[in-house]
Swiss-Prot record:
Protein known as: Cysteine desulfurase IscS
A Pfam family reported for this protein in Swiss-Prot or TrEMBL: Aminotran_5
NCBIfam families (UniProt xref): IscS, PRK14012.1
Source superkingdom: Bacteria
Assembly and binders: Homodimer. Forms a heterotetramer with IscU, interacts with other sulfur acceptors.
This protein's pathway: Cofactor biosynthesis; iron-sulfur cluster biosynthesis
EC numbers: 2.8.1.7
Ligand binding (pyridoxal 5'-phosphate): 75-76, 155, 183, 203-205, 243
N6-(pyridoxal phosphate)lysine: modified positions: 206
Biological process annotations from GO: [2Fe-2S] cluster assembly
The encoding gene: iscS
SUPFAM superfamilies found in the cross-reference section: PLP-dependent transferases
GO molecular function per UniProt: 2 iron, 2 sulfur cluster binding; cysteine desulfurase activity; metal ion binding; pyridoxal phosphate binding
Length: 404
């Protein structure tokens, strides 16, 4: 069996060869395996140097000060640390949090946990294009609101939120603003020296770095305080205890440095491939593009193929590695909660495919995906009585089904 073509770059990315080479220098006796906290000898000093360099590399990509970067095990931990950290530290100021229904589960489930601790959370509806209406956010703000958490780029539909406008609204109301940037770092320009953002979560494995590695930006001016969620040796200025994984950190730093050097050129190439993919589907009947196409990262295309059953479609196109939702929730047979929040029917949400292309995608792979999906969708529709009814001009939404 040949290996399927990988088109699921929003789920994870392969580690860049250059990143892997750097990481290997910090694992064995051939390189430097020291503990960065061992400040009494050469091995610790060299490891600490590597960690400091990586901290600068991550900070440089996003316009931050290196002292504002806190290492974590990934964006999920960063989201937890930011949201719980603010809620617990500033609980006397208020207990209300605002987020969006289309956020990643790492944000939604963290807010739900805080609700069990007697905090209150408001989950806003997005507009049908996936973007947040600022007026909806304005109306949700209360005197006891302490935090707004809105992701920069959605992991399923790839839309880019206007975090500058959202942040300005938060500043006007003296509310902390957290942004999950796992899907935007290296794809969208981020300058935290100018953006009104207090906390921002990052992931290494979404940007051709290693899994199990992330960071949280915590603003210093004006100073943002968070309560630690993990206790121990007081690492990361007391915000996140635990021995630093030097090789992972070096990998994340290198991945961010490569992204900074190559982002403009890479985005141009990926956008051309995405547009080629889109052009292959636009003339098909009953195809719906999910999410705003203007405010969107280059590599994402989320399409619903009406009158095709979701699981059948995913099985039919198993020669390409794609997803029908977030990788974190795709084991569920429920339709995507993100697409349902946009107002899509269960049927359309079920029949969606998320194509995400990246650094190693080729034109030949895009053409293969177009041909495969078109062929399989046509075949599945030929087997569908609903498709026959649609072709006969019957409005299926008005059909009254009876049980036997």
């Amino acid at each position: 069996m040949s290996t399927p073509t990988y088109m699921d770059y929003s789920a994870t990315t392969p580690v860049d060869e250059r990143v892997a080479q750097k990481m290997m220098q910090y694992l064995t006796t051939d390189g430097n395996f020291g503990n960065p906290a061992s400040n009494s000898h050469y091995y610790g000093w060299k490891a600490d140097e590597a960690v400091k360099k990586a901290r600068h590399q991550v900070a440089d990509l996003v316009g931050a000060d290196s002292k504002e970067i806190v290492w974590t095990s990934g964006a999920t931990e960063s989201d937890n640390l930011a949201i719980k950290g603010i809620a617990h530290f500033y609980h006397k100021k208020g207990n209300h949090i605002i987020t969006l229904k289309t956020e990643h589960k790492a944000v939604l489930d963290t807010c739900r946990q805080l609700e069990r601790e007697n905090y209150e959370a408001t989950y806003l509806d997005p507009m049908p294009n996936g973007l947040l209406d600022l007026n909806v956010l304005k109306k949700a703000i209360r005197e006891d609101t302490i935090l707004v958490s809105i992701m920069h780029v959605n992991n399923e539909i790839g839309v880019i939120q206007d975090i500058e406008a959202i942040g300005n609204l938060c500043r006007e109301n003296k509310i902390f603003f957290h942004v999950d940037a796992a899907q935007s770092a290296g794809k969208v320009t981020i300058d935290l020296s100018k953006l009104p953002v207090d906390l921002m979560s990052f992931s290494a494995h979404k940007i051709y770095g290693p899994k199990g590695m992330g960071a949280l930006y915590v603003r210093r001016k004006p100073r943002v305080r968070i309560e630690a969620q993990m206790h121990g040796g007081g690492h990361e200025r007391g915000m996140r205890s635990g021995t630093l994984a030097t090789h992972q950190i070096v990998g994340m730093g290198e991945a961010f440095a490569i992204a900074q050097a190559e982002m403009k050129e890479e985005n141009s190439k990926i956008r051309q491939l995405r547009d080629r993919l889109l052009a292959g589907f636009v003339n098909m009947e009953e195809v719906v593009i999910n999410g705003d196409m203007k405010n969107r990262i280059p590599g994402n295309l989320n399409i619903s193929f009406n009158y095709v059953e979701g699981e059948s479609l995913m099985m039919a196109v198993n020669d390409i590695a794609v997803s029908s939702g977030s990788a974190c929730t795709s084991s569920s047979l429920e339709p995507s909660y993100v697409l349902r929040a946009l107002g899509l029917s269960d049927e359309l949400a079920h029949s969606s495919i998320r194509f995400t292309i990246g650094r190693y995608t080729t034109e030949a792979q895009v053409d293969k995906a177009i041909n495969l999906v078109r062929t399989k969708v046509d075949k599945l529709r030929d087997l569908s009585p609903l498709w026959d009814m649609f072709k006969d001009g019957i409005d299926i939404s008005k059909v009254e089904w009876t049980a036997h």
